[in-house]
C-alpha cells in the first residue's frame, strides 16, 4: 500500500509465484503484519490450509471457522452491507432539504447493492451445484421473490431471510411471482419452479452439508485488527464444496469492506484500508470456472475499493491447467495487471513462460532458478536437524514490468515469530523431525 502511495506501483496489488515449501505464506504473513502496524485490516477470506489462523490470533484479530459441523454462512447475508442500512436510515432522519435528497439516493443504491449481491450469490451457488447454467428467468424469479419477502416486513436489512425462507416463498408462489413466471395454474407454477426448488434444497443439505442452512454464525467484524475465515475443515478433495464456500466467503468479505466505505463516505465512520489475500490460488482457480471471472473482477477494482490485493500460487502452470481457453487468458491477465510481481524459486521453463509478461536479466534469472533447487541429499546424525533448501525465504520483487532491475530480498524470522510458531506449516511432522534416524 505504501509503494502505491509513493507512486512506485500503479495499483496496490502483488502476484506471488514460487515452488512449494519456499516460504510464500511466510512472506505474506510478514507483509500482513506490516499492514496491521499501519492500521490496515488484513482479510483472508478463505484460508484453505489454516496457515493464517495463528497470525490472526496473535494480532488480536477475528478467526471464523467454516466447514462441515463448523458454523454456518447465510448466502443471503451480504456481509455487513445490509446491517449499515438501518444506520444510514437513522442518520437520514436528522437531515433535510438537498442534503436529505442526496442521502436518499445513497440509501437506495445501498439497498440495491444488497439485493444484487443476494441474487448473484444464490444464482452462483445454484450454478455450482448443478455444474451448469442457471436460466435468466430463474434469476428473475429469485430477484422478484426476495423483493416481495422484504416488502412483507418479515425481514429487515440487518435481519435477512435464509435459504429456507426463499424456498418457502417460491413454493407459495404469489400472484406477482406467477405472473412474472407466466404460470396460469398451480400445475404450471410447480413445473416452473421444480428444478430451482430442487437446486435450492440441495444447497440446504447436499454436498455442502449444512454450511448454508441457517443464519451466519459469526459475521465478519471489519473493526477487528485482522480477519481470517478458516475453511481448512472442508475436505481437500471436495472441489464443488470448496468453490461454493469460497464464493460465499468472498461475497461476505467484500460486502463488509463496502459497508465500511459507505459509513466513511457518509461521515459515520473512519476511512479504513484493507488487505485481501487469496492464497493457494491453484486450488481456488481449479474448483470452478466461475471463480476465475470473480477474481478478475476483484483485480480490476481493488484501487477503487481501498484494497491491497495479494494473489499467491505456485507457477503459471496452475493457470494454464484451467479447463477453458477463456479462463486461461483471464487468469494470465492477473500477472499483467498486478502492481508488482514477486517470484521465489522457479525452474527455467517457468521463467521462459513469464518472459512475455516480465523481463529478467541473466543474473536475475540465474538467481531465481538457483532458488528452485532442493537441499543437497546429505543426512544429519543430529536429532531434529533438517537441511534447508537454498531458496527458502528468498524472493525477487519486480515492481515494474519494463525491464527495470528487480529487488532480491530474504525473509528473516524474529525471535517472537519463532517462539509463537507463526510460520510453522510443518506441525504435523513435528514428532517425525525429532525422532532421529528411522530404519527402512
Spans of model-derived segments:
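Walker A/P-loop NTP-binding active-site region of P-loop NTPases
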Residues: 22-83
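Short conserved micro-motifs at the rims of enzyme active sites and ligand-binding pockets
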Residues: 75-78, 85-86, 155, 238-242, ...
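Conserved beta-strand scaffold positions in the cores of enzyme catalytic domains, especially
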Residues: 63-65, 226-228, 341-343
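Conserved beta-strand position immediately N-terminal to the Walker
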Residues: 14, 43, 227
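Conserved P-loop NTPase motor cores
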Residues: 5-34, 46-49, 69, 233-369, ...
Amino acid at each position: 500500500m505504501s509503494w502505491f502511495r509513493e507512486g512506485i506501483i500503479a495499483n496496490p496489488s502483488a502476484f506471488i509465484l514460487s515452488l512449494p515449501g519456499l516460504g510464500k505464506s511466510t512472506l505474506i504473513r510478514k507483509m500482513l503484519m506490516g499492514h496491521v502496524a499501519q492500521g490496515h485490516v488484513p482479510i483472508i477470506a478463505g484460508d484453505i490450509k489454516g496457515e493464517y489462523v495463528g497470525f490472526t490470533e496473535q494480532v488480536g484479530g477475528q478467526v471464523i471457522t467454516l466447514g462441515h459441523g463448523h458454523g454456518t454462512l447465510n448466502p443471503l447475508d451480504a456481509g455487513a452491507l445490509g446491517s449499515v442500512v438501518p444506520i444510514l436510515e437513522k442518520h437520514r432522519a436528522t437531515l433535510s432539504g438537498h442534503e436529505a435528497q442526496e442521502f436518499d439516493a445513497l440509501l437506495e443504491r445501498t439497498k440495491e447493492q444488497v439485493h444484487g449481491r443476494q441474487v448473484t450469490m444464490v444464482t452462483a451457488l445454484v450454478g455450482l451445484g448443478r455444474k451448469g447454467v442457471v436460466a435468466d428467468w430463474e434469476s428473475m424469479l429469485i430477484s422478484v421473490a426476495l423483493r416481495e419477502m422484504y416488502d412483507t416486513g418479515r425481514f429487515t436489512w440487518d435481519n435477512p431471510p435464509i435459504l429456507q425462507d426463499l424456498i418457502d416463498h417460491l413454493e407459495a408462489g404469489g400472484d406477482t411471482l406467477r405472473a412474472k413466471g407466466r404460470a396460469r395454474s398451480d400445475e404450471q407454477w410447480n413445473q416452473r419452479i421444480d428444478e430451482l426448488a430442487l437446486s435450492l434444497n440441495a444447497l440446504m443439505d447436499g454436498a455442502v452439508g449444512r454450511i448454508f442452512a441457517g443464519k451466519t454464525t459469526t459475521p465478519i467484524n471489519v473493526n477487528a485488527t485482522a480477519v481470517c475465515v478458516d475453511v481448512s475443515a472442508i475436505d481437500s478433495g471436495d472441489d464443488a464444496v470448496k468453490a461454493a464456500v469460497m464464493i460465499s466467503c468472498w461475497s461476505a468479505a467484500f460486502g463488509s469492506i463496502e459497508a465500511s466505505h459507505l459509513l466513511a463516505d457518509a461521515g459515520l465512520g473512519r476511512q479504513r484500508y484493507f488487505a485481501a489475500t487469496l492464497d493457494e490460488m491453484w486450488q481456488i482457480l481449479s474448483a470452478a470456472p466461475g471463480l476465475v471471472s470473480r477474481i478478475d473482477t476483484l483485480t480490476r477494482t481493488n484501487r477503487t475499493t481501498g484494497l491491497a490485493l495479494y494473489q499467491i500460487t505456485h507457477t503459471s502452470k496452475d493457470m494454464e491447467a484451467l479447463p477453458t481457453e477463456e479462463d486461461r487468458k483471464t487468469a494470465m491477465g492477473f500477472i499483467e495487471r498486478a502492481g508488482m510481481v514477486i517470484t521465489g524459486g522457479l525452474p527455467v521453463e517457468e521463467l521462459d513462460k513469464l518472459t512475455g509478461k516480465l523481463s529478467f536479466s541473466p543474473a536475475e534469472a540465474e538467481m531465481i532458478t538457483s532458488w528452485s533447487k532442493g537441499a543437497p541429499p546429505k543426512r544429519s546424525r543430529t536429532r531434529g536437524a533438517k537441511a534447508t533448501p537454498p531458496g527458502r525465504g528468498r524472493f525477487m520483487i519486480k515492481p515494474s514490468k519494463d525491464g527495470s532491475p528487480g529487488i532480491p530480498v530474504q525473509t528473516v524470522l524474529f525471535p517472537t515469530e519463532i517462539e509463537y510458531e507463526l510460520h510453522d506449516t510443518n506441525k504435523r511432522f513435528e514428532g517425525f523431525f525429532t525422532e532421529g534416524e528411522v530404519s527402512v
